[in-house]
Amino acid sequence: MNLKPVLFSFVAFSFILACTHTKKISKTDSMVIEEPSIRLDTIKIVADEPIKKDIYKATNTKLSDIIHTKLWVSFDWQKSQLIGKAELQVKPYFYPTTMLYLNARGMEIKSVKLAEKQVKALPIKKGSKSVVVEDIFIEKPVTYKYENDSIKINLGKEYTSKETYYITIEYISKPNEIKEGGSGAITSDKGLYFINPTGVDEDKMPQIWTQGETQSNSAWFPTIDNPTEKMTNEIYMTVENKYTTLSNGILVDSKKNTELIRTDHWVMDLPHAPYLVMMGVGEFKKVTDEPWNGKEISYYVEKEYEQHAKAIFGKTKKMIEFYSTRLGTPYPWQKYAQIVARDYVSGAMENTTATLHGDFVCYQTTREIIDGAKGESTIAHELFHQWFGDYASCESWSNLTLNESFATYGEYLWEEFENGKDAADDHSADSRFGYFAQSAQKQVDLVRFDYEDREDMFDAFSYNKGGQIIHMLRKYVGDDAFFASLKLYLEKNKFKTAEAHDLRLAFEEITGQDLNWFFNEWYFAKGHPELEIKKTYDGTLNKLTLTINQTQDLKVSPLYKLPVYIDIYANGKKDRKQIWIEDAKNTFTFSVNYKPDLVNFDGEKQLLAKVDFAKTKQELIFQYKNAAKWGDRDEALTFFKDNSRDIEVYELLKIIAVNDPWRKFRSKAISILNEVAKEKESEIKPLLLSIYAKDVNTRVRASALKALAANYKGEDLNALYEQALNEQSYAIASEGFDAIANLNPELAMKKALALENEPSKEIIYSIMDLYSKNGTDANHEYFKKAKKQFSGFELMSFGNLYGKFLKRCTKPETVIDAAKLLTKMASGDNKYVKYTAQKVMKDNLINVWQSKEDKLNSQIEKLKKENQDVTTLTSDLKVITDTKKQIVDLYITIKK
């Protein structure tokens, strides 16, 4: 599951090393072992207060094992309900049992029956001695108790692990009647979602989709809803002929029942976890791409995006080939499909063979992709999950990082392969920043058994920090050993569950090393290293001395063992040294015949640590020019940001803006040069014009145009901004429009009319920003149309600008229409969007019109005291009061 579009961004980890698993022995157990008696002195222990036990979230105990789940489902769109029948093939996991416990949330259970398969020999024909063997099922009702979202089924006899039985349950799933939960990462846990089921919202395609992680699929089919479970499954989905369906595995049959109704039969014949089962239903258009090794690759999108589907998802086949080769493990599943859903409650979800993306993650037109494919890293993340998370799964949510850190690192691997090392390191730096931001809020272990809510595991620790740790492990063991270890881990744990120690054992088997030290400090402890580094050079003795102190709080974090490279640049050469930092205070000396130009700590820029190592301007200039890694150049640019007026830095920044191989560093240099752009107009303006004309990247060109607009005026530039409106790049066009809006709002209002039909969100934001500052009631229709382009968390940004605009509106019909739009906006499942709609309605409509009412009341009272005529004002007051009342009534409905 990818959370970045949701939050997140959405940290660090701890573990209890000495825990033992115990089995309770019941009175009915056949064996009782008596320990020898030992007489001990009596010791009286008195506690001042009760001793609190630490929370320990144990891996789920396996009592029963679902072998196969078969579902028959149809849908009542009007009621947002699923009518279902489930047939579960079950056996006791190991110990004999007379009971079966299933998770089933918010259901109406119609019946529960048990069947046993029996073999019966029947004569081929009357009087014949030849027989045919048939499997027959003897079905009978069983007693059960359904409470607390669980079905407790009495099997009527004891079954052993060698016996299989079948449970059939008829039920109605009522997801909208479930007491809804969720978290910042996954905002709802209803499991089954009917989006605009009655079609009341003409802007949103009616659809059904599911979200199983963490344990929400039991809201639409009875199961053992836990990551320890693995099963095969199939599903018969009865729908109207106009709808397309998607589920796990292969569509083996589609049977027409009537002129309007058909049943699709999907079969998943490889085992996976219940939370990975999915359904999608709607008037989706299926776009089929070139297969990979005979396996179908397909994309399910709304009609408007059918022509763009291959532009959005077209690298999927290349990704599958890359990951299959890199991991030494061919893509293991039957097909790979991706579907895009409206009002999705997270970012994306790695359902086996059928990933679901929120529309705000992936939907772009082919023209928008000119400026960059915004969903590419998410597509890579979810695909990598098909190996790490689906093929080999974490055995418990405590070990979630085995799923999410690898999917996060899958993003890095793809960026590295497809877009180069700079792109990968830049992506990694964003992830590292997300971890450090959350680590300032809390400190937890990577693998943690003491979480209060399993949803808490979906954070920047399981994702971001875990991905950084995997990268450090790769750098420590080397690429060959790293990928060989991953191959072994996947082979040993395929179609099974694993914990962090299984990963360690795979690496140890390949490398021959004991890696407990690495896993103990990174997987089973909190925090990260904080290093204070100082250097001295003795020219007489030709000795370089480095002192490196670990300054992290050792009451919270461990004393780390850190293998790291030191690159020493002297006399035109680079000399690499490996050191091991193991103590709180460490001193290293090196023989260096010349005074170093630069001592570069962590030459691979792979260490997850806060590092305090002061460098001079000359060292950082040298570092930028000679230490080529992304992290080296980024560190230098960070220093240059506050020193742009230094002549050496200034001259180098001009070179960076043109020549740095990484487009974001070129843009960053342009941004830094803004500080001196006005005082250096004769040099900077021509430079920016040249970059705008020649740079190959549209984002860099847009940065140059933005800098020109921020610093200079002139007819030549005005013409340039108007020309920019005709660029294919929306990034450039929006910067041109913003420049016109800042210089000449009246002209921008006219130019906006020609751009109002553009689907680009960058253009839409620019126009909405203009209208929020200069618009009138007449521009409200644009906001209504623009809203159709936003969904999910994007609606929060839309709401912010919409609210500012509504303060400018004066007509009752406009604000009542706006209140209705906000009511519709609040009708989805995203609680953050609901909050945004409520806040806009209260702050920008109710409070504004309350203020109008109060002001007019005061004016009327004053005029009455002066015996003035207030007939017109009283009439105006009635309009305002009635308007406010209608808004308040709508507000009350969305607050319920």
Where are these regions (language model features)?
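Bacterial Sec-dependent N-terminal signal peptides
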Residues: 1-30
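Sec-dependent signal peptide cleavage junction
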Residues: 19-60, 854-896
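Acidic/His-enriched low-complexity segments
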Residues: 19-334, 460, 475-477, 493, ...
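Hydrophobic alpha-helical and helix-loop surface patches within well-folded domains
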Residues: 23-29, 109, 115-117, 266, ...
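Non-catalytic accessory/interaction domains
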Residues: 211, 239, 262, 287, ...
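Structural detector for internal amphipathic alpha-helices that build alpha-solenoid repeat scaffolds
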Residues: 605-609, 633-645, 655, 664-679, ...
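Amphipathic alpha-helical scaffolding segments comprising HEAT/armadillo-like alpha-solenoid repeats
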Residues: 613-623, 646-658, 678-692, 712-725, ...
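Extended alpha-helical scaffolding segments
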Residues: 797-875, 879
